[in-house]
Amino acid sequence: MAAHWLVSREALEKVGVFSRLFPIYGNDDNWCDRARFHGYKVGIVPAARAVHDRAYREEPKEKVIYRNYYMGSLVRLCDINRPLWERFLYVCLFTLVKAVKYGSILPFKHFRSLVRMLPEIRQARQAFR
């Protein structure tokens, strides 16, 4: 899925650009969380249409787990609208649920990566306030 944006210059200057913590997925969610933190409203225009020129392709299970679990967890940890401890607790539970759902230990491996990133996540959360 791709996002198509209409953002004022003022909002872009106040909220900032995409975070470098998100190499590809999760940027849009993180930016919207930060915009809400700064008092901006985020909306969807159901009648708007845009085309994202991307061919459908099957993805390996590992890539789906990475995108759905790891990037989703990273978005949650970076949400400056809620305390980090609350987000971390949520991600701990989310890890267990996803491991059972996928029948895989990959969420636990990704969880370790997220724990190692906590200092950088704390720094990013502070920088975007």
Named regions from a protein language model:
Residues 33, 75-76:
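Active-site phosphate/pyrophosphate- and oxyanion-stabilizing loops and adjacent acidic/basic residues
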Residues 1-16, 21-49:
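A short, conserved alpha-helix in the catalytic core of glycosyltransferases
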Residues 25, 48, 55, 61-63, ...:
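A generic "cationic amphipathic patch" detector
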Residues 16, 35-36, 55, 60, ...:
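Short, function-defining helix-loop hinge/capping sites that tune catalysis or transport
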Residues 16-20, 55, 97, 101:
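A broad detector of the eukaryotic-type serine/threonine protein kinase catalytic domain
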Residues 64-73, 79, 83-129:
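Non-catalytic, C-terminal membrane-associated alpha-helical segments of glycosyltransferases
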Residues 37-41, 51-72:
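Nucleotide-sugar-dependent glycosyltransferase catalytic core
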